[in-house]
């Protein structure tokens, strides 16, 4: 995903050098949560059972962001099944932190 983001950023730089913009979010780096499908990546929603299922297409939100000129460069961790419970954990990655209360 990161390599594709670098390629997209270079393409957007080329457009900008020609005086063109891809949209109102031209070149803005955007992260998406792991519940959104991005072609060629997994959308696990924090579940091990989805780890090897590679998305064949983008979620509508991802397509909208790309159409507006964003650069999607990373997917961020989510608690298992997107359910909010304490602690926010996933069997795939490290502890998911709550941004307002970091000790939880």
Regions flagged by a language model, labelled:
Residues 1-104:
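Gly/Ser-rich catalytic/binding loops embedded in alpha/beta enzyme cores
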């Amino acid at each position: 995903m990161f390599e594709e983001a670098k390629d997209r950023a270079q393409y957007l730089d080329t457009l900008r050098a020609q005086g063109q913009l891809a949209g109102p979010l031209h070149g803005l780096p955007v992260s998406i949560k792991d519940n959104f499908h991005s072609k060629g990546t997994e959308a696990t929603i924090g579940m091990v059972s989805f780890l090897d299922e590679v998305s064949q297409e983008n979620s509508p939100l991802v397509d909208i962001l790309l159409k507006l000129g964003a650069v999607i460069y990373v997917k961020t961790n989510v608690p298992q099944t997107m359910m909010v419970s304490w602690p926010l954990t996933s069997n795939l990655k490290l502890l998911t932190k709550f941004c307002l209360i970091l000790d939880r």
